[in-house]
Every structure is written in C-alpha cells, then in structure tokens.
Regions:
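Boundary/entry segment of secreted carbohydrate-active catalytic domains
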Residues: 24-71, 76
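Short, acidic/polar
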Residues: 51-67, 140-148, 201-211
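Aromatic-lined substrate-binding rim segments of carbohydrate-active enzymes
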Residues: 58-123, 174-198, 234-238
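Active-site groove signature of glycoside hydrolases
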Residues: 115-119, 140-175
Length: 247
C-alpha cells in the first residue's frame, strides 16, 4: 500500500511539474515579441474578385498602384481566363496588369498553375471537365509552360509562385493534393527560368512540411477571423508562437 501511495505521489508531482512547464512555455511564447524590423508590404490583386465586387477592375488596379503607391503586387494567371478554349491562349487582361505594374516599376509575384487565389481555388476551364486525369495533368503542365514562356522576359517579375496552397485539401473545389505533380511543375518552371519559386501553404490548417521543402521560398497566411456558411464566424486565437513553432 505504501509503495502504491509513493508511486501516486511521484506521478502527481511529475504531472504537476509537467503542467507548470507547459503553462510557462505557453506564457513565454505568447507574450514574446516577434516584431520584424525589415519587411516589404505588398498587395494581392484579382481581376475576377474585383468583378465579383462589381468594381471596374482596371480602375481599381490603377487606384491601388497610384493611390496606395504599392511597390510589390501579386498577380495570378487563372487557367479559365488564359485558356478558355483548348489551345486558345488569352493573355490580354493579365498583360495589361503586368504592363501597368512595369510602368510604375512595381515588383511582381506571378501565380501560375491550376490552383490560384479565391474561390473555388481551382479555376478550371470548362473544356477540361470529363477529361481523363492524365490528360488534365498533361494540359496543366502545358499551361504552366505557356505562362512562363510568355512572361519570362518581364524583368519586374521577381518570383514565380507555383500553385496557391497546393497541399491544402480542406478548402476549395480541387482534386486531392499531389506532391509529385507539384514537384513536376516546380521542375518545369526551374528548367524554363532561374527566378526563385514560391510555394505557399495555409497558416492555420497545414503543417507546412511538404510545401516548405518543394520551392525556393515559402509563404503562408494568417487569418484571425473567417466565415463559414454552416458554422458562422470562426476566430483563431493563435499566438505568434503557433506559426514560429511550425517554422
């Protein structure tokens, strides 16, 4: 009986010490300063989302460049916009965005691939619906090559972003994530141009391991509040340590 009592006492002390250590570590990292002294501010621009908001997308983009005077902008090449019909390539609107940024000496991150920002994430052209998966992949790689070939002489494009959060399966209407296909895309872009490749992943819903080890640069998100049609508003009370730990 005495042995059992001693064992329980030791276990209780050990659990208490462990609890104190965990709480202390949490408090330390929660209140620790993570201020970044050197960083660049930029914006993301989406033609389709501007239209969704019933804005004149060209006037909106010019206002962002001239009124906000941003020097870094992220643009996208949604598949359904640049190849609306098989082998019919339309770069007119994206060319306009790129040229307006170049006029003002704005640095560009260009997103390419099947998955680009904003719902439904995978902006598939209608003509790929029903095609065998291997054909879709073949066409996807061809689309990536076309985009890089079209823009690789634009010096203001500093970074290629290949896909947008490609390992995130919890959001968007997309096929399951495929790290091997992502690596194929990255390898293809590297063979076409030597600028760095950015891979992104969700700040709250992913572990970053696969994405962070695929490109030259890694980017993530930080959401404090999101809205879900079934659950309503969701609040992420996550300290900086949450992101620092994953990094």
């Amino acid at each position: 009986m005495k042995r059992v009592t001693k064992h329980l006492v030791r276990l209780g002390i050990s659990l208490f010490v462990l609890f104190v250590l965990i709480i202390s570590a949490w408090v330390f990292f929660y209140f620790r300063s993570y201020q970044q002294k050197e960083f660049k501010l930029g914006v993301n621009f989406s033609k389709s989302y501007s239209e969704y908001l019933e804005l004149n997308w060209q006037k909106t983009f010019v206002a962002i460049l001239d009124d906000l005077k941003v020097k870094n902008v992220r643009l996208a090449a949604p598949w359904n916009e640049i190849e609306p019909v098989k082998d019919h390539w339309v770069f007119t609107d994206l060319d306009w965005q790129v040229n307006e940024a170049v006029k003002r000496n704005v640095d560009i991150v260009l997103i390419l691939g099947r998955r680009t920002p904003h719902w439904p994430e995978c902006h598939d052209p209608a003509w790929i619906i029903g095609l065998p998966q291997e054909i879709v992949v073949e066409r996807q790689l061809k689309m990536v090559q076309k985009v890089v070939d079209h823009y690789k002489n634009v010096k203001n494009i500093k970074i290629w972003q290949v896909e947008n959060e490609p390992m995130l399966d919890a959001f968007g209407i997309c096929p399951p994530s495929d790290i091997n296909l992502l690596r194929q895309e990255v390898s293809l872009v590297k063979n076409l141009d030597d600028r760095p490749i950015l891979i992104t992943d969700s700040g709250e819903l992913s572990f970053w391991i696969a994405a962070a080890n695929t490109g030259d640069l890694f980017g993530t998100t930080m959401y404090r509040v999101t809205h879900n049609p079934w659950l309503g508003y969701l609040y992420y009370h996550l300290p900086p340590a949450f992101y620092n730990f994953k990094a």
